[in-house]
Amino acid sequence: LLVQLERMCNPQMISKVHNSKNEKIKEFEKLVENYFKQYKMPSFYADKLHVTANYLNKICKTETDKTAGDIIRKRITIEAQRLLHYTNLSVNEIAHDLGFDNVSYFITFFKKQVQTTPEQFRKLANQ
C-alpha cells in the first residue's frame, strides 16, 4: 500500500499525467480548428480523441477553466466576427459558411456570445 501511495504521489508520475492532459488539449484545439464549421458538439471531438465527452470536458475545465463546448463556441464566434469585420458577406452567407442551417439560429447564437446582433457588430466594427 505504501509503495502504491508513493508511486501515486511521485512528481514524475503527476507530471506525466499533466503532460498527457496538455497533449489532449492541444490535439482537441487542432481538431476544433479543422472541424469547427462542420461539428459543434464536444462528442465528435471526444470520439476523435478516443475519450468520453465527460473526460474531455473535465480536462478542458482543469487546463483552461472552460468546457469543451465553450472552446468550440469561442472559435465559431471568432470566425463569425472576423467574417463580419473583414468581408462583405451577408449574415446569411456567414451563417451558411459556419455550418448553421438556419440563419435565425446563427443570429441567436451570435447574440448570446457577443451580446449584439451580427449586423450591429458589423456596424460597430467598421466605424
What do the PLM-derived regions correspond to, one by one?
Residues 62-107, 123-127:
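Terminal helix-turn-helix DNA-binding modules in bacterial transcription factors
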Residues 7, 11, 34, 38, ...:
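Conserved amphipathic alpha-helical interaction elements at protein-protein interfaces in regulatory
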Residues 43-44, 93, 120:
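Alpha-helical residues within helix-turn-helix
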Residues 5-30, 34-48, 62-70, 74:
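Short, Lys/Arg-enriched, Trp-marked, Pro/Gly-tolerant hinge/linker segments that flank
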Residues 42, 53, 91:
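Helix-turn-helix DNA-binding elements, focusing on the entry/boundary residues of the two helices
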Residues 48, 97-98, 113:
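Residues within the alpha-helical elements of helix-turn-helix
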